């Protein structure tokens, strides 16, 4: 579609009064290059931005997929090399997110407008404003060389946080290798490495074939160009200007090999750890005045690894041989191309959680117990993991059966195995820092018989939809309700389109069983707004006689609903319930109703709350009498009125409690 692009650009030039000039067109290898000249005389430079001449020339490269894909824009000079969003010194990065920012309907008019906006911002030095996600210096990497997940913050370890003379600093990344993937687990100084070696505290192998090794991290206090060097010679030259000469660079690589050899890491063969180095430079933001480290990594080619091994093994006593090996190493730096590795940032200091502002952030750092690992409990447990809980324990005595696979997150290989065990195994793979624990105990006769053991949790989620479990929780928490964790009990309606979650805070009079009783009473005659359909589904009157039995024999009746419906409803109930926990004005007892049916009208979710009751202990200790505070006040008022009107000897009908 280069003809379309050329025609649009020609029409723009004709009506631009000379501001846009089409100078030439060249088509080669399926790409059309349109050379244009733009009037940029009105764009002023400020804040160290790029300098523009009265007119600037650009090469617009149009592919066969135009206008579905945006054209690329290059310049013929390198005057703007080193500027943010200028790659390879000539390529202008106009779109941070083309799928959002490029509109095919705008065509060349939209491209020229975007280019003009880019030039204005580049001249004003505003291409990387504070608070925007970082566009780092560009290192052209490939997954074939491996990828690195960086997890620990560097914080004050960087040399540019103090006013001292130190411009270069060497640290070591303690890494775990799984295939081509490398995880940086922590940063260590050289002395810490030595101390751990002496203490035999550095292991070379872990579980499931994980290999551990050390890789050097060189931190320099000045930013490199926006494109990182493509050859070892250019990188070595850049590092030399910042205080790390070629001999020191080679020494860094050699020392890393010596350390890994001492640890016992495999350095040769298919299972060898990579000879690699990480480079850290100051990023240009995140907040004003704060310079965080931007990290890249490069992998030595096989010859480079062999040379560093030679440098390690040659004896200083063999002066001539050592000099020849050193010359060989310098020669290698001169011709070796850098193999940049892909970096995946997971450092909290430079990344932002994608769930920022979500109610589920309340779960971060919490210890959570999930009872039941079915269509309700399994999705909730997974949401807890992704929300950042510090501990998760799941309990279910049931086994995975073929019929549940259509709506519960298990697979064919899980059939016959315990649900909780299989769920915990899968969820433990989501995060590197958390192992989910499980139990197949009977919740009523096992878990709830030791209530004190449950006080370690911040939240208990009852996803069993089992009345026996709900009653068991009421009894277990009765004597220690002030210390009992916040508890969510949830259940689905008969078609998994409606559901209710109850929330009881620490110290609440009742939990799920009691709150559902209150809810059924309060919605029985005149249901509050939004509750009628929910009440008819969950508390049918008369009770529903037709039940769904999925398997022959004595299988338990259940609801109907697909995986999409159960996952959506479970997530909606969890978000709504946690919103109550995160609020500051929640009643001690709350019920949340979620109606996801297509025909629903009115507010959703809907919410009812109750204050604590007055609790009167039974003399036998077997019962607990709970009286609504308002009802108790009315009873007292009536008994006092009766005494006053009828006298103290009149039978009150049991109202004098």
Protein language model regions, located:
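Adenosine-phosphate binding glycine-rich loop
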Residues: 486-599
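A structured beta-alpha segment of the ubiquitous adenosine-cofactor-binding alpha/beta core
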Residues: 424-458, 464-466
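Glycine-rich phosphate-binding loop and adjoining beta1-alpha1-beta2 segment
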Residues: 397-433
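Glycine/serine-rich phosphate-binding loop and adjoining beta1-alpha1 elements at the start
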Residues: 149-366
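Glycine-rich adenosine-cofactor-binding loop
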Residues: 356-401
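ADP-ribose/adenylate-binding Rossmann-like module
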Residues: 459-503
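Compact alpha/beta protein-protein interaction domains typified by the UBC
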Residues: 24-109, 113, 158-159
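N-terminal beta-strand/alpha-helix entry module and adjacent surface
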Residues: 599-657
């Amino acid at each position: 579609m280069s003809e379309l692009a050329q025609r649009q650009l020609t029409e723009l030039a004709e009506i631009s009064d000379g501001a846009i000039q089409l100078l030439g067109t060249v088509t080669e290898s399926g790409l059309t290059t349109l050379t244009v000249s733009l009037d940029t005389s009105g764009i002023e430079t400020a804040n160290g931005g790029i300098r523009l001449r009265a007119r600037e020339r650009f090469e617009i490269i149009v592919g066969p997929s135009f206008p579905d894909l945006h054209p690329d824009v290059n310049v013929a000079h390198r005057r703007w090399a080193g500027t943010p969003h200028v790659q390879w010194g000539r390529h202008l990065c106009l779109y941070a997110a083309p799928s959002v920012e490029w509109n095919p309907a705008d065509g060349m008019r939209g491209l020229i407008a975007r280019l003009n906006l880019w030039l204005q911002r580049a001249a004003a030095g505003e291409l990387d404003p504070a608070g925007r996600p970082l566009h780092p210096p560009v290192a052209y990497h490939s997954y074939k060389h491996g990828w690195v997940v960086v997890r620990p913050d560097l914080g004050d370890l960087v040399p540019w946080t103090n006013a001292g003379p130190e411009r270069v600093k060497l640290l070591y990344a303690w890494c775990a290798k799984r295939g081509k993937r490398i995880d940086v687990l922590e940063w260590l100084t050289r002395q810490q490495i030595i101390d751990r070696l002496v203490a035999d505290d550095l292991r070379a192998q872990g579980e499931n074939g994980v290999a551990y090794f050390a890789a050097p991290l060189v931190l320099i206090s000045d930013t490199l160009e926006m494109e990182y060097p493509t050859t070892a010679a250019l990188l070595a030259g850049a590092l030399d200007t910042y205080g790390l000469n070629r001999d020191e660079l080679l020494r860094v690589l050699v020392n890393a090999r010596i350390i890994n050899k001492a640890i016992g890491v495999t350095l040769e063969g298919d299972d060898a750890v990579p000879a690699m180095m990480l480079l850290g430079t100051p990023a240009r933001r995140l907040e004003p005045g704060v310079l965080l480290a931007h990290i890249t990594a490069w992998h030595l080619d096989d010859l480079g690894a062999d040379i560093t091994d030679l440098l390690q093994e040659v004896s200083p006593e063999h002066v001539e041989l050592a000099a020849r090996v050193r010359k060989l190493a310098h020669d290698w730096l001169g011709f070796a191309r850098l193999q940049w590795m892909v970096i995946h940032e997971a450092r909290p200091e430079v990344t932002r959680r994608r769930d920022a502002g979500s109610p589920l952030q309340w779960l971060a750092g919490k210890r959570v117990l999930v009872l039941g690992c079915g269509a309700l409990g399994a999705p909730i447990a997974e949401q807890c993991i992704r929300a950042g809980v510090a501990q998760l324990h799941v309990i279910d005595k049931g086994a995975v059966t073929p019929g549940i696979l259509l709506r519960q997150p298990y697979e064919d290989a899980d059939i016959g195995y315990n649900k909780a065990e299989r769920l915990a195994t899968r969820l433990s793979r989501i995060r590197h820092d958390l192992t989910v624990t499980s139990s197949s105990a009977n919740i009523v006769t096992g878990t709830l018989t030791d209530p004190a053991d449950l006080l370690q949790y911040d939240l208990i989620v009852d996803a069993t939809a089992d009345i026996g479990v709900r009653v068991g929780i009421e009894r277990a928490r009765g004597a220690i309700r002030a210390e009992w964790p916040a508890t969510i009990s949830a259940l689905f309606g008969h078609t998994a389109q409606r559901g209710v979650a109850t929330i009881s805070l620490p110290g609440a009079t009742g939990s799920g069983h009691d709150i559902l009783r209150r809810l059924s009473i309060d919605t029985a005659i005149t249901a509050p707004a939004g509750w009628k359909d929910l009440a008819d589904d969950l508390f049918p009157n008369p009770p529903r006689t037709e039940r769904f039995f999925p398997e022959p024999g004595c299988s338990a009746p259940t609801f109907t609903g697909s995986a999409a419906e159960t996952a959506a409803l479970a997530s909606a109930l969890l978000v709504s319930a946690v919103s109550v926990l995160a609020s500051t004005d929640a009643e001690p007892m709350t019920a949340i109703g979620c109606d996801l049916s297509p025909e629903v009208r009115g507010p959703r979710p809907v919410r009812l709350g109750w204050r604590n009751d007055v609790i009167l202990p039974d003399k036998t200790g077997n019962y607990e009498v709970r009286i609504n505070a308002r009802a108790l006040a009315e009873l007292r008022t009536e008994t006092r009125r009766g005494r006053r009107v009828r006298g103290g000897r009149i039978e009150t009908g049991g109202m004098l409690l």
